[in-house]
Amino acid sequence: IVTAIDSFKGSMTSMEAGQAAAEGIHRVDVDAEVIVRPLADGGEGTVEALVSGMNGTLQKVQVTGPLSEPVICEYGIIESTKTAVIEMAGAAGITLVSDEERNPLNTTTYGVGEVIRDAIDKGCRRFLVGIGGSATNDGGVGMLQALGYGFLDKDGNQVPFGAKGLKVLEQITDTYVLPELKAVSYTHLTLPTKLE
């Protein structure tokens, strides 16, 4: 028997949920062979699921959180393919912001770009990015700022973090973009849906 259960946001990881199911199965049949595997939909738990299933390693890096505070973000590297596995939720996730502070006008994806930058520095050129669980609505502007893009107001200054910066955006520049980005490929991971 294989248990593969997605996380329960803010209360139980995928592995904890799978282990709880395995314990329930063993109460009914102590001899049952149960294998617990992580599962994720692109949000919380994506790094754990993919790194575990692909024999990767976990990395930790301090980045700018959704409210510009320092946070420690965990991501994975699959060394055999120089692939980084990143969760937007780890650097810009809704669980990093208290209920009282949740305001997409003020939250940024800058930390996601910092994670990408760290992985590039470690030799990664392929990226699997889970975009679920975000506390942001800046269109990825913060992430791109961290990678060297300029998002400028009418006076030539960087726009403020968060969706509020989009209102004053006048110009986008690529003068300081990391040159390594030309050799990078991305795949975004989201919950699959079926439209009927």
Predicted regions, residues:
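Glycine-rich loop at the start of a catalytic domain that most often binds anionic cofactors/ligands
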Residues: 47-55, 75-78
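Conserved small/polar residues in nucleotide/adenosyl-binding loops
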Residues: 187-193
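Short, structured active-site "lid" loops
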Residues: 51-69
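Glycine-rich beta-alpha junction loops
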Residues: 40-43, 67, 189
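Glycine/threonine-rich beta-strand-loop-alpha-helix active-site module
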Residues: 106-110, 114-130, 135-182
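N-terminal phosphate-binding or glycine-rich loops at protein starts, especially the Walker A/P-loop
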Residues: 1-51
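Anion-binding (especially nucleotide phosphate/pyrophosphate-binding) glycine-rich loop
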Residues: 70-136
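Structural motif
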Residues: 1-2, 33, 58-59, 82-86, ...
